[in-house]
Amino acid sequence: MGNNFKAPENSHQHNQIRKDTENDFFSGIRLNPDVVETYYIDPVLVTGLEPQSIEAEQFRQLKNNILFPEKGTPPKSIMVTSFSPSDGKSFVAANLAISIAQNIDEYVLLLDCDLRSPSIHSMFGIGDGPGLCEYLSQGIQLPSLLVKTFLDKLTIFPAGKIPPNPAELLSSDRMKRLIKEIRSRYSDRYIIFDTPPPHLTAETNAISRQVDGIVIVIQHGKTRKKDVLNLIDIYGKEKILGVVCNFARKGIGYGYGKYGYGKYGYGQK
């Protein structure tokens, strides 16, 4: 997976975009008519805001590597995680979800399972409402927590309020039942889990056992080779879809074994 990304300018700000805009974001994309006319989108969603950019093209390559594997069937449930909290896992998960949803026939459900430091809701400008935490702790029904996005075929399951016991919630039997339920109920779509680093949280390992494949995000110049190999050993080689490298300088690329590393430049978790 050779992928090139540059750091989006003013990544701390949100773009205000209207449905009648000429911005490339809406070119060839089916919008959700039920969502309000104005969207506040984080500039890090390069696959939507800059669909003709090198960054968006690299995400399309990442998507194609996953959707069209050399062997076997495509993984329908995908966990995106990282070695460290600031390696860019949410950036990769969100842009991968958009890229898949831009396909003609593909639908995507994106879950923010980082209950300690959630960010998916902020990226998509959907507000700070209830989500996974409330489902696990209060028994709120799943359909009422799913949030429609500006893309007709992309749905978000936000993290909700930060709980005092994230490890217990994500390792619970109710979480296991949730994964089984969404895989059964939404078998027609790809399901992407944005999860925290496994060496910091035990709950990520519980989720990894219930997904079809895993994408690991690392940081160039920071994550050590032995740390990556340790993650691969934890999850098992058969589960690893690929490893992507964030923050790399342009023109730098390398790989560990059969797992491809790309060239990213980005500065958010």
Describe each model-derived feature in a short phrase.
Residues 1-269:
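P-loop NTP-binding module
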